[in-house]
Each structure stands twice: as structure tokens, then as C-alpha cells.
Amino acid sequence: MKEYQVYLERARSRQQDFLYPLIFREYIYGLAYSHNWSRSIFVENGGYDNKYSLLNVKRLITRMYQQNHLIISANDSPKNPFWGYNKNFDSQIISEGFAIVVEIPFFLQLNSSLKEAEIIKSYKNVRSIHSIFPFLEDKFTYLHYVSDIRIPYPIHLEILVQILRYWVKDAPFFHLLRLFLYHFSNWNRFITTKKSISTFSKRNPRLFLFLYNFYVCEYESIFLFLRNKSSHLRLKSFSVFLERIFFYAKREHLVEVFAKDFSYPLPFFKDPNIHYVRYQGKCILASKNVPFLMNKWKHYFIHLWQCFFDVWSQPRTININQLSEHSFQLLGYFSNVQLNRSVVRSQMLQNTFLIEIVSKKLDIIVPIIPLIRSLAKAKFCNVLGHPISKPVWADSSDFDIIERFLRICRNLSHYYNGSSKKKSLYRIKYILRLSCIKTLACKHKSTVRAFLKRSGSEELLEEFFTEEEEILSLIFPRDSFTLHRFYRNRIWYLDILFSNDLVNDE
């Protein structure tokens, strides 16, 4: 967040409702440029690029205003001869500027809310993705029913802009934003297809992530308001921290905002044991009560999306299942609640009784098939999971090749170390290890056996399997029972702030 202090101090002297002048500030695009370079680990920063200069931005905006909207076609190629430049690259420049500017007022609100609530220190401790799973382990073992919900996309990007207008009132800024979206995302279509939204999100990830997260934040605000109104467990206040985006904390005044829409008595059933978890575009709703109440919440979700956000969702896409019989996918894991049955013999005087005890345990498993599919897509193995060489890396040195494979293996091992069964994780390590050996053999134009015999690389490649043990041995003796127990059990690393590309839900 430190990189935003430069323009945040300048923005504080202005009213937050007027963001249009900030679009024409040089330092905004300097920050956008540095943000793009900092996200890349394969390219060195060569300094400030002239393509991110304010002069080019002004020229692009002027051309947008002068462009005749009627001659824009939905099938415009990325390089339009009328424009005379690459629209994809220019779209990225302006969208980064839009994203930085529109984040300013919400980041200021987040800072003020954190200071008022005096939770600045605790805020740093709740950023981990893996903090969700200890919550699931504590709560879900007492619940019976779960609903796996995919949050629907809006049919048009105008819906996302309209939601944002409720919070930022700056007509010139939104006029320019609409003009930008019209040119770069085929807004002349009546309905924006999911494919075009996906294309726009890949070309302009930061702006789309902001707009989409704001839409999700608004939907969650109403949902939590309804949940507070229907539950015995009233929440005094709550905060919505959107992943990897520095947004704001919402408070109890949302009751006043939506009171006019829900002024009549709500026919709710009391459900004090409902739990809601979301990451990206997927959410899990679980409850202890009968399926009838879960079905009622399902229809509330559907009507909420249709009436307030004009988003259509089919009721059959939301299924209600028993936790003991259904696995749900979240954050790259398959999770379900297993019933462990044990029989205890109890004796009272001369009578003996057999007592059956049923305990529940949240079982979190590595999804081996999706992971192998992702590795096959990245050319580390075939679709059956057989390791193959990666010739595109053969130009690098042996050390760089091994380091690349080890980095991927460390990331996956670090992320999936909380799984209850490690066999699938060991198989992924095995695939990466053999793929690394085959890549080195391909580089040296040799067979795998001849390469290993000549170079003696077995000891070096043992790092694929021994790294976790070496880390734990710094804390526990290598021959201790504690080390063996910790190595076999799940360990949640709470410093993980993002999901690896290979474990995305999509």
C-alpha cells in the first residue's frame, strides 16, 4: 500500500467526488507503469516508458471523444487502421489509470474505517487465503447442509458502472469511463457475452477486478443485512475485505441505506447457524437446519440478483446437499465432512454395552485430476499424467532449469500442505521431478538414464522431496516423533496471500 501514499496525500486536498481531473495527472500513469513492472518476475525494470506518458494519454482520450460511435464495429481487430495504434495496449494504459483513480476514495474510506475500529494491526493478520480453512474446520463439522453457489456475471458492463455511481458522483469521470468501455469492450452489443467479459478482464485485469469486486461487495452488503435481520446472532458491525484489492470497510449504516427497500416485515425464519464463505466468484452457504430453510435462502439469492442487479440466475444451478455426502470445491481443494464411527465397550456391573460413537472431521483433499490437467496444459506432462520434457526451457542453464521446477514445486507444496492426504501431492512432485530430468536430458541431447549416470544429479534433485523435512528439522530434531507427526499432518501456511495459477477454480 505504500506505493499509493504519493497520490493519496494529493487526493486528500480535493473532494473525493471529483475524480475526473486525476485522470490527467502524470504520476497516476507512472504508478500504473511501476505496478505493471512489479508484477512481472521475468523482466527487469528499465525505467519509465514514454508510452505511459501523460501526452499519449491525452491524445488517446481526445481521439476517443472525436471518434464517431456509429462506425465502430463489434468485430474491430486489435489493430484498427483508423486508430493507427494497438488498441489492446492503449486499453491497458487507460484502464490502469481508471483503476488507480477510482480506488482512491475507497482506499481512504478503508483507512478511516480501520482507524475508527482500531483494527489496523489485526487487519494484517486476516489477509491469508488459508485462514478460511481453520474456520471451516471449526464450524462445518457441526453443520448438515451446504450450498455451492457460483456468483453470476452481469449481462452488461453498464450494470457494474451503475453500481459504482451510487458511491462516486462525478459525471465527467463516468462519461469518460463509459466512452472507454464502449471503444474497448464492444459496448454496442445489447448483451455482453461471458466470452467478451472474459476477454476484457484478461486485457484489463485491474479495472475489471475492481468493478466486479464492487458488484460482489454490494450484493454481500444486502445479503449480510438480510442475514442480520433473520438471525438471532446480530452482528454489531462487519467488514468486507475484497481479496488483493485495497477497498473499504462497510459498517452498520447499510441498514439505513436499504431500509426503504425492505420497510415491510420480512417473513424470515430464524436461522442462527448459517455460515457464508466466498473467494473470487464462488461462495459456500452452509446451515445446520432443515433443507427447507436453505431452499428459502436459495430463492432470496436468486431474487436479489434479479431485482437489484438485473442478473439472471437459474434456480437449478444452486444445489443443496448434505455435507456428509457431498464434496465442495474451494480455493483449489476438495472438501467434505467425513463420519468416523467407533465402537466402545462399556461395562456396568455384570452387564456389557456396545456404544457407537460418531465423530465428524473435515476432510480436505488435493484435487489430483484438475492439477494434472493444469500441468498438462503447462506442458509438464500429458493428459494421463506421464511426465514430458519442456523444450522451451532448454536454452537456460542447468541451474536455472532446476530452480524453475523447484519454484513451482515449492509453491504447490506450500499451498497444498494443509491437505489431509499427501499421496496426491507426492505424485505432483514426482511428475515435476521427472519433467525436470527429461528437460535436462533433452538439453544435453541424451537419455534420462545416461544423463543421470554422467552428471550424478540424483542428489540435487532430491530437493523435490526433502525441502519440507529440512524446514521442520530446524524446529524439531530430525529423529523426533514430533517431526514425523507434523510432517504427516496438515500444516496451514497463513502467509499465503494469493492462489497459484495452477489452483484457480476456473
From Swiss-Prot:
Which InterPro entries does this entry report, sorted A to Z?
Domain_X, Maturase_MatK, Maturase_MatK_N
What main location does UniProt list?
plastid
GO cellular component: a single term: chloroplast
- The answer to whether UniProt assigns keyword Secreted to this entry is no
Q: Which compartments does it reside in?
A: Plastid, Chloroplast
Q: Which residues form a coiled coil?
A: none
Name of one Pfam family that matches: MatK_N
Q: Name one GO molecular function term.
A: RNA binding
One GO term under biological process is: RNA splicing
Annotated signal sequence is none
Q: Which domain of life is it from?
A: Eukaryota
- Record key words, sorted: Chloroplast, mRNA processing, Plastid, RNA-binding, tRNA processing
Family listed? Belongs to the intron maturase 2 family. MatK subfamily.
Q: What does this protein do?
A: Usually encoded in the trnK tRNA gene intron. Probably assists in splicing its own and other chloroplast group II introns.
Protein's name in the database:
Maturase K
Q: What is the species listed in this Swiss-Prot or TrEMBL entry?
A: Trifolium striatum
**Gene assigned in the entry:** matK
